[in-house]
Amino acid sequence: DRRQRQMCIRDRLTIHSKSIGIHLHMPMIAGGIGVPMEKLRMIQNHAGGTFGYKFSPTNEAILGAAALICKRPVSLVFNMYQNITYTGKRSPAFTHVKLAADEKGKLLALWGDNFIDHGPYSEFGDLLTMRLSQFTGAGYGIGSIRNRSRTVFTNHAWGSAFRAYGSPQSFMGSEIAIDCLAAKMGIDPFEMRAMNCYKESEGTTIPTGFPPDVYCEEALFEKARPLYEAGKKRVAEKNAGSDGRHRRFARRIRLRSGRR
């Protein structure tokens, strides 16, 4: 009705947003542009799969400030440069990981010292930093873990939520360490992983000390082993037929865990 329409616009700032955390963002935006909460109205537009991108406010505060200054409806459309530079990015991690194993390759311990560069803002940086300690070494039964993770703030791009929150950063460190350890011990990297994956018979746990919901990795490695061996044979045959002129492009087989 007419009265309701007037109430919606009278001395009240209205912002349309595709936020996936609209009640979380409202106080952040209100505080940022100096508008009391009772004078700010947020309308959630339909949004598709954001993969975490809109777990952070992006252009809402800019729109709000522009509307207050212009005292009229405003619209903002980013060009490609602005879309790249004015939105949050996956925070880079700097991980230092050490692994210990017995003479057979069975993992005994993990030590880690990690940093998350979260850019200039603290928004959810603590949660992301926790992920480095939760996920580094995940997938393997490691009886002793000492892993310290810290957040640092810089003038780099501000950190936002991204798909597989913290997992790529964590697994980059521990999976490279697994490869290095396997190479030093002369153990096939596939077999090193199969030997140390979660096993219900051994009561192995995730890095936080809890058992996984499902013990499935052992069966997956058994299923993948013949495919892996066939792949190794195929790659060896192709490389053997090479004249060596393109050695840096030599074929190899890759292992991917597929974990998130």
Language model regions located:
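Structural alpha/beta core scaffold segments of enzyme domains
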Residues: R3-Q6, R10-R260
